[in-house]
Curated annotation (Swiss-Prot):
Task of the protein: May be involved in transcriptional regulation.
GO cellular component: nucleus
PROSITE patterns: ZINC_FINGER_C2H2_1 (PS00028), ZINC_FINGER_C2H2_2 (PS50157)
Xref: Pfam families: zf-C2H2
Record localization: Nucleus
Major localisation: nucleus
Keywords carried by this UniProt record: DNA-binding, Metal-binding, Nucleus, Repeat, Transcription, Transcription regulation, Zinc, Zinc-finger
Gene3D superfamilies tied to this protein: Classic Zinc Finger
Protein name stated in the entry: Gastrula zinc finger protein XlCGF51.1A
Organism: Xenopus laevis (African clawed frog)
Record-level Gene Ontology MF annotations: DNA-binding transcription factor activity, RNA polymerase II-specific; RNA polymerase II transcription regulatory region sequence-specific DNA binding; zinc ion binding
Amino acid sequence: TGEKPFSCSDCGARFTYRSLLRRHNKIHAEGKSLICSECGKPFTSESALTAHQRSHGGEKPFSCTDCEKCFAQRMHLIEHQRTHTGEKPFSCTVCGEMFTYRAQFSKHMLKHKRKRTEGESLDCSHCGKHFTSRSDLTVHRKSHKGKSPLQCSDCGKCFKYQSQLASHQRVH
């Protein structure tokens, strides 16, 4: 959702994670931050500033050997190369879903965190199916409109046809 609950008390910058706020706070604590002359963005290291400044000049010295696409930052090349290898190094400890990019993974984890912090159930009350986002649950609920559910008395799972319910109940 792009929620950024952690804010800097010095400048008001907002962050998704407390660790990013702590890293940002070094800019204020060290007293001598490095500032981009193009946009005024502050950095704590010379290498981070140099990598950032490439984005203004259009310089892209890192190229992919598979497709020759070029990148301003080495890390962006490394992430891109995963599209060729199929590597998905970021794994959700809650549901097991795997991700190629850290940004995708972080966004996904926010869904689980939001569910825990809000105490909100993202389970369909009609059939019990679980969802990681409120919008997916809302769309799913529409699939039940106009249906009279046949519900298992043991587990609450619903079925469209009596034969499906009977078959399911044999499992219990």
